[in-house]
Every structure is written in C-alpha cells, then in structure tokens.
Regions:
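N-terminal amphipathic/basic-hydrophobic helices that include classical n-h-c signal peptides
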Residues: 1-21, 145
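Generic alpha-helix initiation/capping and coil-helix boundary signal
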Residues: 2-6, 84, 462, 762, ...
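A detector of low-complexity, intrinsically disordered, Ser/Thr/Gly/Pro/Ala-rich segments
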Residues: 8-10, 29, 378
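N-terminal accessory nucleic-acid engagement/regulatory domains that precede
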Residues: 12-67, 747-749
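Helicase motor core with emphasis on the C-terminal RecA-like subdomain
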Residues: 39-79, 83-86, 90, 95-190, ...
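Short, mixed charged/polar active-site loops
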Residues: 112, 157, 537-538, 564
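Extended, highly charged accessory segments
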Residues: 245-248, 427, 469, 476-552, ...
Length: 814
C-alpha cells in the first residue's frame, strides 16, 4: 500500500477544486497563488494533465516541557515561541529517554527545534558538547545563525561555531577548546577532525549529541562513505569513554527508520507525524503542447517553465524555478533577466543559485531572497535542502527531478510561512517525465523512494578501515561495522601500511590516508574556473570533477549568473579552466558516448529467445565533442571537437541479449536490430527507474556488444549508429559476431544495489516496456517511448517503435 503524500492530510485529485480567477480577490496576497492556479487551469486546460490539492492543515501543539531549563524557555518566548508542535514535544521526550532518534516531517515543519532544544539544554545544565553534521556549508551557516539568534534572545552563552574548509587556522584551536556546538560536514569530519582527534580531546570527552540533518541526501556512494565515517567517529568516541546519542532528521523518504539505522549501525526511534500547520497547496502536472504530431514532439519544458515563471512574477508572486543542470539554470536565468532586468535603473529581480558559484555569491542570493529583494530565483538541487530563502509562493520544476521524494521536497519550498502555494511540474520530453504526467494517478499513489546505501561495499570499507587504523590502532577481534576487521587489516599489512604484533595493528606508513579518500566523487579534486578577462586572473567558480568533462572542455560556453565565459584552456591535471568573458548568441552542450565490458556474471536466466544477466561491468564514458545551440530558436549552429581523458568506473549492471540466430530470424538487417535495441533500451530504462523507484541519475543505460567490441548510440535522426572502441563509426553488417546487448547499470562505483532487484524482475520489466510502447499514441516512436527521431517515412513495420517492440518481444517468454 502506498504511503501518503508528504503531508499528513491525504492528497486527492480535485477536478473542480482549484479556484477560478473570480472565486477569490487577487488583491488578497494569501490567495494569489491559488488564484494563479485557477487562471492557469482555465487558460491552459489542454496542457494540464493532473490537478491536485492539499488542504490547509491545522497545527497540533504541546506545551513547553516542564523540565526545559528556564533560561531556554525565556529565550524561546523572546522569539515568540510559547508552545511546541506535537512532533517537537515527542522528540524532546524521546531524546530525554536516551533513545537515538530520527525525525521525518515535511519541509518547514520545525525539525530544527527537535535537536536544538536538547542540545542547548544539555549545554546549559551539564556543559555537554554537540556535533552537528550537514551536507552543505550553506545549511551549516544557517544553523549557526539560528543558534546565535536564540543565544542573543536569551543571553544563553552557548558558543556555536562552524568548522569547515573556510575556517581560518587561527580560529580552529579556539573552536576545539571552547565550542559547545560545532557545526560541520562529513568531509571535514573525515579529513580534518577524526585524523586529528587528539587535538579535540576535550570536545570528545564531553560529547553528548551527534546531530545528522538531511539524511535523505546521504545515499548511494556518498551515503555509504558517510556511514563508514560515522563508524570511525563512534570508534574515536569510545576511545574517549563516551557514547553520544544520535538525533537524525530527514525529508520524507520511504524507509527513514531503516536508512537511519544503516547510517549509524544502531536502532533508532522514528517520529514521522508532523504537528506543524500547513497552508493550502496546489499542484499542477503540465505537459507542453505537441508541436509535431507525427513525431510526437512537444514544446520544450524550458519554454514552458519560462512562461510560467514570467506569469507568476508578473502577478507579484515570489517564484523559484528548479532546473536539472547548471547549464539550464543559466539559460533560464538569462531568459527571465531579458524580461525583468532590462531596465538598468532598477535593481535586478532575477538571480541564479547553483553549485560552482563562490560562497559569497550564494550567501548574497540567500539574503536578498529572504529580504524580498528578489522576485525570481533559478536554482538546482542545491536549493532542495533546507537553506532558508524566506517565503515563496510558487515553485516551478523544469522537468521531473528523478524521484517522488525530491519532487515533494522542492514543492515544499513554497508556502513555508503557511500561506497558500502552487507547485507546477513541467514535463520534459524525457520518457520518465512523460510517463508520470500521462499517468497522474501514479504520482498520487507512489510512495517516496527508499534511500539505499552499502556501507560494507568492499572498496569503500577498506578505505575507511585504512583511515580508522591511522586514527587509532586496531586490537585483535575488534569489529568495524558488523564484522571482524582482521581480514581487512591483513590486506593492509600486506601493502606495508600496517604492522600487526601482540594482538595490535599499528599504522606504520608516512601517508595521510584520509586525503586519498573522496566521500563524494570517483576522483579527487574540484576544478577552479579562472577568469583572464582584461589580463586578470580571478577565480570565479568551482566545478566538481564529475561535471568538468561535460562543462569545461575547450570551446565551451560556461555561464555564471547568465554571463557567458568561453573556456580558452583546460588544464586537466592542474584542475584549472581558464576563461574569458564573451558575447555570443549560443550556448554549448557536450556530446558523450558510453561503452561497457562485462567483467563478471553473478547470475543469469532465460528471457524468451534470449537471456538476462546480472554482474559486474567496466564503463568508459568519452566526451567526443560539443554542439553550439542558438538561444531561443535552439537550432544547432555548429560542432566542436573535445579531447579529454575517458571517465571510467567499475559497477554492477543487469543486461539482456539475444543470440545472433534469433536476431537474423526476427530482423531483416542488422541495422534494423540495432535500431530496435536502442529503442528497447530507452523504454526499459524508463520502466526500470519507476520499478525500483530510483532517481534517474542513479541508473544509466547503454547498448553495445556482448563482448565489449563495439557500442551504439542514436544519431541525429534517431537511428542506431555503431562505433568501434576508438569512437569511429562502424558498419554492423561487416561484424563476424553481432550480439546487441541492452545494459542498465548503477551510475556509481561498485553499485548501490539497483541492479540486483532489476535482475530479479527482468521479465516484468520487459512486459512493462512493451505496455508503455503500446500505450503511446505516436506512430513511429517518440521521446516518450523509444526516444526522439527526426524522420518517420518508413513503413509501419520498420519504424523505430515497431523495431523496439520486436526486440522486446524476443525477450518475452515463448
């Protein structure tokens, strides 16, 4: 049975519940977003596939706890807080009972007080310390600002400090000695605190609480690393004779209790019922209009998001637009600035917010939004988390963010001050987007996704046992996680970094292992963007390693606050991109290819005339060039070459293949089979993402040979093109062995557990893929089923849609 929507009130489809423009006066600011929803429903009825409403919800309250320190009660009263929400009172009771706790309530429901009250109370009465961990610096700085406000209101004297990479060296000792609450992030704990725990002895000896917020963001490889960092933290705490309590918080996910327990390795109590009041929320599912019925092509989500944001801002509503990439943030920001910021005598009303900007720029955007000086903000998932940007009226999603949980997290940014709000999901041509807006019932009924981590993934675990051995010697029989660490210690001893003697394993190497372990990326090191305009050399942005190949190649247009910079030189080894400001009427988009090779088969099964498999694969991703795309018209005006190192990873995958004899019987040519398998891969990826409720970015697809000799991609016409391992075009007709294979693979090193359940359901996935194609109303294939195509003049039995159906039929039971 599906879990309810991320509010305690159930979400229901209300075909006539949204107010018409005349139902309520637009002059009343409390109903502006509702009135806009009504106007949109009337004016754009043909584009709205789903209309839902969450009614306003009354708050449930509890008095301040009797055992709350009087000074803290006075501080709360000074800030206008004279009672608690019910979940805050429940959290106080649970923490006071000694339980480890996870609080899972909607955005803006007051989760912060769930841990602030016990932490400050303990600091006031027992001089106890607390460590806060947040996934981003912005959240950490928000939290310190909140604690300082509470301190100021009650003259409490509790000392709270951030400890991150920006903390000056001369301030670090004072923080270690005098901080009651130290607010940091997993990376700093991993690299700067645990390896130097002896400098933190006084802090650790008095550590009472460990607060881990936004735990839904700790999933996949990052979450698996963080779980091991917490294992190391508890090991150091035990050395200092303390066993701190955990207080964890999360946005709505499908498995909060299980996920929290996997992170900390201990049982937790879960609080999932929110007592916070909520304003009326309206949700629209928006499918752009069809512009080419034959090909099933629709207007771009970008143009529709731009239109919706313009309408909302012109109506005086504070609006946030979420884009799926940094590039799209800049493109949408430019479009909105062209409308609203054209008058140089008036202050800018539109801002961009994304990773890669300098911290000062992001903090300024946050302050301006809170103060009401910005009418429209365009951001990436960086704004999903709880950064305070004040009250918003409208949230527009430029494309489905990849998960139900992330969708509600983003919609939750509006209506944070209990006013009515509007959220609009604008579907892109991505098949997953189309699947959702065409079946709005799925969106209502779907449970939020499960967060998956694998703390015992061998490479990750070995990395952290190495770090833990540097921090403290291991004793014979000592576990790390649920198992004895001895086999891992023996491996490290063989490499010469550990020495075992007398039941004790000591670190003997000169290296500093934490520096060699990245929690967030396959490889270490962000790239800095250096502006050389006018002969200067100024660092203006940072780009993480995984995005550098797609955004910082030579010739790329790299946009910052919608200002275009051209990349003149990329120093890959030095992690620097040199840019100059430019004036062009286009942006650039990378062209990349993926090839795979099977390393090991874990399991296999018959799948119709073919077979399905689960195993380990080697993935190589190559950026081969880029396209120049003109603003507004979106026409492709040219190409450029890219020469960069290949990006490689080992991961797990599920794959399907059909023997050559069966292919030759089903298809008139190898080219037809290649087209069919590319369409099948597109469709299988869509239904697989939904089946395991994964985020689209966690699961990738590819088509290649069973032996890794070639790979395939769709050309500009949407037809299959075979390429050899050096990336050169090839002809499938000349191959001695032709066994096209569809791969769905975990997008993280070692995998995050997606491929195994997909293999278990391989037959079901093929049936769902066939049903998706059958339900699609296009004639020849389209982005919603088999992928985009540019020509559809073939006979019906030779269209990409028909060929994909034929390929999938070979994989069904005979």
């Amino acid at each position: 049975m599906a879990a309810p929507a991320p509010e305690s009130a159930a979400m229901t489809a209300l075909p006539h519940a949204l107010p018409s423009p005349d139902d309520r006066p637009a002059a009343d600011p409390r109903t502006d977003s509702a009135a806009l929803a009504g106007r949109l429903c009337v004016r754009y009825a043909d584009r709205i596939t789903g209309r839902f409403s969450l009614p306003a919800r009354e708050g449930r309250y509890a008095p301040l706890p009797e055992d709350l320190p009087p000074a803290l009660a006075r501080a709360l009263a000074a800030r206008g807080i004279e009672r608690l929400y019910s979940h805050q009172a429940d959290a106080w009771s649970a923490v006071r009972s000694g339980a480890d706790l996870v609080v899972v309530t909607p955005t803006a429901s007051g989760k912060t007080l769930c841990y602030t009250l016990p932490v400050v109370a303990a600091a006031l009465t027992r001089q106890a310390k607390a460590l806060y961990l947040f996934p981003t610096k912005a959240l950490a700085q928000d939290q310190v600002a909140e604690l300082l406000e509470l301190n100021k209101a009650g003259a409490l004297g509790v000392k709270a400090f951030t400890f991150d990479g920006d903390t000056p060296g001369d301030a670090r000792q004072a923080i270690r000695l005098h901080g009651d609450v130290v607010v940091s992030n997993p990376d700093m704990l991993h690299q700067a605190i645990l390896p130097h725990h002896t400098k933190w002895a006084q802090f650790f000896e008095n550590l009472k609480y460990i607060v881990v917020d936004e735990i839904h963001s700790y999933r996949g490889v990052f979450g698996s690393h963080v779980a091991n960092v917490l294992r190391r933290l508890l090991r150091v705490c035990a050395f200092y004779g303390v066993n701190p309590q955990f207080i964890l918080c999360s946005a709505t996910i499908g498995n909060p209790k299980d996920h929290a327990e996997a992170l900390i390795g201990r049982p937790v109590r879960a609080i999932t019922e929110s007592g916070a009041p909520s304003g009326e929320k309206h949700v629209l599912l928006w499918n752009p209009p069809v512009v080419n019925p034959d090909l099933g092509l629709r207007a771009s989500a970008r143009s529709q998001s731009n239109r919706l944001a313009r309408l909302a801002i012109k109506a005086g509503l504070k609006t946030l637009v979420f884009a799926q990439s940094r590039l799209m943030v800049e493109v949408l920001t430019k479009y909105l600035k062209d409308v609203f910021d054209h008058d140089p005598r008036k202050p800018a009303r539109i801002r961009a917010y994304r990773g890669g900007y300098l911290p000062t720029e992001r903090r300024e955007a946050e302050r301006d939004m809170r103060a009401g000086r910005i009418d429209g903000l365009v951001g990436t998932s960086a704004l999903e988390l709880g950064v305070d940007i004040g009250g918003l009226d409208v949230v527009v999603l430029n494309g489905y963010p990849g998960s139900v949980a992330a969708t509600w997290q983003r919609f939750g940014r509006a209506g944070r001050r209990q006013q009515p709000s509007l959220g609009v999901l604008v579907a892109s041509s991505d098949p997953l987007d189309q699947y959702l807006v065409r079946q709005p019932g799925f969106f209502i009924d779907a449970s939020p996704e499960h967060a998956r981590i694998h703390p015992d993934q061998p490479l990750i675990r070995l990395d952290h046992i190495r770090c833990a051995a540097f921090e403290l010697p291991f004793l014979a029989g000592e576990p790390f996680g649920s198992d004895d660490a001895a086999p891992w210690l023996e491996v490290l001893a063989e490499t010469g970094v550990l020495h075992g003697e007398g039941g004790r394993w000591e670190w003997i190497a000169d290296s500093y292992p934490a520096n060699a372990v990245s929690l967030r990326a396959v490889a270490d090191g962000n790239f800095v963007v250096v502006d050389r305009t006018d002969g200067r050399q100024t660092i203006i942005a940072e780009v993480d390693y995984s995005a550098a190949a797609l955004t910082l190649y030579e010739g790329a247009i790299h946009m910052i606050q919608s200002t275009p910079y051209q990349v003149e030189r990329l120093d890959w080894d030095g992690r620097k991109a040199y840019v100059t400001r430019t004036h062009v009427d286009y942006y650039t988009d990378a062209i990349d290819y993926t090839r795979l090779k099977v390393l090991d088969r874990f399991d296999g099964a018959i799948a119709g005339s073919g077979s399905a498999h689960h195993g380990e694969v080697h993935v190589v991703r190559r950026v081969a060039g880029y396209k120049k795309i003109r603003y507004y018209s979106h026409e492709n005006i040219g190409y450029g070459p890219v020469t960069l190192p290949d990006q490689e990873l080992h991961t797990t995958a599920v794959w399907w293949q059909v023997p050559q004899a069966a292919l030759e019987a089903a298809f008139e040519s190898r080219q037809a089979a290649l087209d069919g398998f590319l369409g099948a891969a597109h469709t299988l990826h869509t239904v697989a993402t939904v089946a395991v409720m994964a985020e689209a970015r966690d699961l990738h697809k590819a088509v290649g040979s069973g032996d890794g000799a070639w790979f395939a991609h769709a050309d500009g016409r949407g037809r299959g093109q075979l390429r050899s391992l050096d990336g050169q075009p090839g002809d499938p007709a000349v191959l001695a062995r032709f066994v096209p294979t569809v791969y769905l693979y975990d997008a993280y090193p070692g995998g995050v557990g997606l491929s195994e359940p997909l293999f278990t359901r391989h037959a079901e996935l093929v049936q769902h893929a066939l049903a998706l194609i059958a339900r699609c109303d296009c004639r020849a294939g389209c982005p919603a089923c088999t992928g985009p195509i540019l020509a559809a003049d073939e006979a019906a039995e030779r269209t990409p849609k028909s060929l994909a159906e034929r390929a999938l039929s070979l994989l069904t039971a005979v």
